[in-house]
Amino acid sequence: VEAHLASGRFEPLLVLRRKRQTPQDRVDALRARGVPLHVVPGWSHAATLWELVRLCRRFRPDILVAHGFSDHIWGRLAGLLAGVPHLVHVEHNSRERYTRWRLAQSRWLAARTDLIVGCSEGVRSALLDRGFPADRTVAIPNGIRLERFDPADRHPWAERRQAAVMAARFARQKDHATLLHAVALLKQRGIHLPVTFAGGGKSSHREAAMALARSLDLEDRVTFLGHCPDVPGLLMDHRICVLSTHYEGMPLSLVEGMAAGCMPVASDVVGVRELISPGLDGDLVPESSPQALADSLQRIVEHPEAAARAAQQARRHALERHGLPLMTQRYEDAFERLLHPAAR
């Protein structure tokens, strides 16, 4: 929304659905920054829907963009009821929690939706596999605020800590266990590679990872940092970023690691594999394979010159393809085509 405000091409309004975990301080911070926003009730789908309809009739948008499961269902239903001219659905993950009924609702809405956006080619493919219309389903890759990584070139790869970071929330989707087992294998091989885990998430998953680290006797080389207020600084202090995961949409933490000039190593899964060309700008390893991950990390330790070149190429890739202004331009160009189809 801030990017749309900055571009001046559209008048945006951010609508948030209040949930139990919605942090009020973040809402207040957005308002303090001048972000136009409205919070709708989230205690029931009916309450959300009714307030969205009222808001749409008052604001009278030309386009309603509904993000995320299952909010994209209620958002588009409200848009239909309020007579919003154009509806856009944005999908953020390759493996959303669609039940048969929710999928039927989404397909029904898809026939009345102008544009369906996957945040990566992997997500677009997943949408097509679920039966969404190919002629209106596109990929617009996520972008990040690249300016936070401007100092990366002042942190030469060879002068960084020979250590790895995995910046990811603790959740069932992520695979912290495979990285821990890989570190244990490296220890058996006589290779000392410290690893820092940064991120919040579910305490049960975090505690399970910490217990596994203790059982593998890794307390001398594994750090659980929790929430990190300066992820760019953390990444730019390390040589390697790792994303061990089961599936993704478009992993911004990996893009951030690349922008920070780290050598990226990640699981070869949907939403990830399109980011990395092994041997050129990082490495991909089979999902849930501690052996393969340990082998990859060992190659980086033993061949630092090649890893430094890959890290440099990864940074170039992130800067060229994943900036927030580029993502905003792609969305706004798509919106213009909806509003002015004759200009296509």
Predicted regions and their residues:
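A conserved mid-protein helix/loop that constitutes part of the nucleotide-sugar donor-binding site
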Residues: 1-3, 166-191, 207-208, 291, ...
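Glycosyltransferase donor-sugar binding loop
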Residues: 14-22, 167, 194-208
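Short hydrophobic beta-strand element within catalytic cores of glycosyltransferases
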Residues: 15-16, 263-266
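A conserved, positively charged/aromatic
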Residues: 88-117, 130-132
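Carbohydrate-associated surface elements
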Residues: 122, 143
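Aromatic "clamp/platform" in nucleotide-sugar-dependent glycosyltransferases that forms part
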Residues: 227, 246
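Conserved acidic donor-binding segment of nucleotide-sugar-dependent glycosyltransferases
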Residues: 278-279, 283-290, 299-304
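A short, well-ordered alpha-helix in the C-terminal region of glycosyltransferases
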Residues: 299, 306-321, 327-330
